[in-house]
Regions:
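A structural signal for well-ordered alpha-helical scaffolds and beta->alpha junctions
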Residues: 57, 86, 140-148
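Radical SAM/AdoMet-radical enzyme domain recognition
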Residues: 1-107
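Short secondary-structure transition/capping segments
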Residues: 23-29, 59-64, 115-130, 166, ...
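Soluble, non-transmembrane catalytic domains of enzymes that act on hydrophobic metabolites at membranes
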Residues: 154-158, 162
Length: 321
């Protein structure tokens, strides 16, 4: 923190206590991202589905709120059978918009051994040895667009405002961000792309970097954010919904981020489409590498390349060989 960084703790929360949280705050912790989902096989929560786990999420959110001044985020890995629970998780987050700052849904991905072979240079690799290749479900190709469709069944006006595209597939949404404004009782609207551009550009001009995590006090300034409605039509609509009841101006309006992350996609020609400009890069052996693929770095020292199993047939069909 003394170096101008924002120390964020990514954790399952099992060992966190109010006493430890207080010590970490004194040490400079900026925020917590709790990874909680029904596939973790948690002691005491093994039978709970995503909706049931909202009770556990609330425990951690209240703990951080009681300590004060610490950003509160939740991650959940989304599988085919848990996709339907996202609207209920967002309902819970809406109900606690005053203490929950960010909800992140990470779509599950697994090593694809059905359609591609893996190579390190000329050597074929058995990727079954890596830990993230266990118990692969039927679907490992859910897209961010599908998640949005599911959310809109409950929140028809749900509207993302910013994204990162794929490194190999520019029209894919790898990080898809939405920002909603509301109270515990009602969501009034969403931030538009113009407002997000203004915020990020202004922050970059002032500090030379882009805005990510914010203190909880900033998430309570939803009314101030409505001023950007002069330039952003989504916030303008939000403003008019909000002032229909003039007495609302005496209540706090909260901002809450919702992020959908779509990890690596395997394209038909074997290319791997990663997140372009990935914010979760980590330093390994003096280089920036994808943190979600550290197992390959640890075991092989490189990210492994993929080629279609029927590559020879494809090349012959195209008269390349």
């Amino acid at each position: 923190a003394d170096l101008g960084c924002k120390p964020i703790v990514n954790t399952n929360g099992i060992a966190l206590t109010p006493e430890l949280l207080h010590e970490l705050k004194l040490a400079g912790v900026y925020g917590f991202t709790f990874h909680i989902d029904s596939k973790q096989n948690r002691p005491g929560w093994k039978q709970a589905d995503e909706v049931g786990l909202n009770e556990l999420r609330y425990k951690f959110a209240k703990m951080l709120a009681a300590e004060g001044g610490i950003s509160c985020s939740f991650n959940s890995t989304i599988f085919e059978d848990t996709l339907i629970h996202i609207p209920d998780m967002l309902k819970w987050a809406h109900k606690n918009i005053d203490i929950v700052n960010v909800m992140v849904f990470i779509i599950y991905r697994a090593v694809d051994n059905r359609d591609v072979d893996w190579y390190l240079g000329p050597k074929k690799i058995n990727m079954g040895e890596l830990v993230y290749n266990e118990d692969v479900p039927d679907r490992v190709d859910i897209m961010a667009d599908e998640v949005v469709d599911v959310i809109r069944k409950t929140y028809p006006d749900f509207d993302p405002c910013a994204y990162l595209n794929g490194s190999e597939k520019a029209d894919s949404f790898k990080w898809l961000l939405s920002g909603r404004l509301g109270t515990r009782k009602r969501i009034f609207g969403y931030m538009g792309s113009k407002a997000m551009e203004i915020v990020q550009t202004a922050y970059h001009l002032m500090y030379g970097k882009y805005l990510s995590y914010t203190r909880p006090k900033m998430n309570k300034k939803g009314r101030s954010m409505l001023l950007m409605g002069l330039f952003d039509k989504k916030l303008r609509r939000t403003f008019f919904k909000y002032i229909k009841n003039p007495f609302r101006i005496f209540r706090k309006l909260y901002y809450q981020s919702i992020m959908i992350i779509q990890p690596v996609d395997f394209l038909e020609d074997g290319r791997q489409s990663m997140c372009d400009g990935c914010p979760d890069m980590t330093v390994w052996n003096g280089k920036l590498v994808y943190s979600c693929r550290m197992e390959e770095q640890l075991k092989y020292g490189y990210n492994i390349r993929t080629y279609p199993k029927d590559l020879v047939a494809i090349l012959e069909k195209n008269k390349i060989v």
